[in-house]
Amino acid sequence: MNLYSALRAITDTPDATFLRTPQGRTLTYGDLAAGSARFANALVALGVRPGDRVAVQVEKSPEVALLYLACLRAGAVYLPLNTAYTLNELAYFIGDAQPRVVVCDPKVEAGVATLADAVVTLDAAGQGGLSDLAAKQAEAFDTVARDGADLAAILYTSGTTGRSKGAMLTHANLASNASTLVKAWRFSAADVLLHALPIFHIHGLFVALNVPLMAGAALLYLPKFDPDAVLRLLPEATVMMGVPTFYVRLLQDARLDAALVKGVRLFVSGSAPLLAETHQQWAAATGQAILERYGMTETGMNTSNPYEGPRVAGTVGPPLPDVSLRITDADTGRALPRGEIGMIEVKGPNVFAGYWRMPEKTAAEFRADGYFITGDLGLLDNDGYVHIVGRGKDLIITGGFNVYPKEVEEEIDALPGVIESAVIGLPHPDLGEGVTAVVAAAAEAGLKEAAILRLLTTRLAGFKRPKRVLFVDDLPRNAMGKVQKAALRDLHAGLYAAPASPRKDAG
């Protein structure tokens, strides 16, 4: 089953609008069929065969959507790459994935050509060698038959835990997750999704493209997140998907109010934790509750707060239909009762086929009964909602006690003047790890380290309280808004290092 064949609106409603840009450019579903056929024929002309990888590092444009669909139709494996990656980083991905063709921006073509044999270009305006070749091709293409277990895409993990791993996603993985979300979030052909996300990531690509494609919905397609453009277009939208940073920035604009978003039926947040404070502020400003969900590169979406029913701030909702989720002891795999923190494990048709060229790593990440070990810590409450506590790697063990960073962060974030915080463990000569808070605070608040430590004395047990508080203007984030705690740990690794003792002469 080729995923493209499940996107029935492309053939069933060719005159319906699929995509509109702020500049007024429009693509219908019929344009998708014709354009993706041209691009598929172009890929075949470049030597792409079923199962070949096509690496894509280009700026967002309507042509990228056509290229993605063309890869599906040609039976190729789509491999999107973050546009921020340097040539040095690209060398790893290209060397690992061995793509048949690399599609890149013309500005980096010369460098990429030193890494790959077949390189074609596509710029932010949708122009370049690939689009020129596609323009010469026929508007008909026989979509290649694929089995559900065949690979549709490889997405490399963000690398926050070390070397990036290529998550292999099948046609069945992507089709099942899109179908589940269409039902869970009540998508229909009447919807208009405001799309301001990048499309090299699972959120912007497989959630915010596949779901509307499967429902026959339309997109307001922005090249990137721009608050002015979003606020201007929100009255025309029925759904918006974003990362927490989007919502935080929109809340800073006085134009945001209930009247502006009266036509929007759903705001979705993901890719990074949404602060409960942001959830509450958004509801106060707009009268609507953001729907937070939980997913990852390897699985697509696993849980979602309900479309109908309470959307609980600080949770990511119950497991989606067809997804089995349990909380376990990380060492033994023993299932834990509700309310206890442990490792989140999931199983379902959404779960990936494994890591590209890493069979040992793949085997290590799955239990014998097929559950995938996510690496995320959390708990199930009595209502069946999942609470994410943090990454397992972020757990701090200080003096033999376990400290969950999110618990400490929530207390710090609640302090007046604090914008946000990240709590990390750093090597400590006495405790093993020292709890350390990195805080972004409002300049006018005049917060001091001693004041924060004093305020936390009545809020947290002594072993949970930070040994130090460090102030920064902004927390480092990756392209999807996740705080890069690994970078903070590397930067401050020597904070508690004991000064070298002067050597005493013998005698």
Where are these regions (language model features)?
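Conserved AMP-binding/adenylate-forming
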Residues: 25, 41-88, 402
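Conserved AMP-binding A3 loop
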Residues: 26-30, 152-176
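Conserved AMP-binding/adenylation subdomain of ANL enzymes
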Residues: 175-192, 200-239, 253-255
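Conserved beta-loop-beta connector loops within the AMP-binding
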Residues: 326-345, 364, 382-383, 445-449, ...
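Conserved pre-ATP/AMP-binding loop-to-beta segment of ANL
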Residues: 15, 137-156, 163, 186-192
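AMP-binding/adenylate-forming catalytic core of the ANL superfamily
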Residues: 85, 102, 295, 348, ...
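ANL superfamily adenylate-forming
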Residues: 107-148, 497, 501
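Gly/Ser/Thr-rich phosphate-binding loop
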Residues: 237-242, 251-311, 324
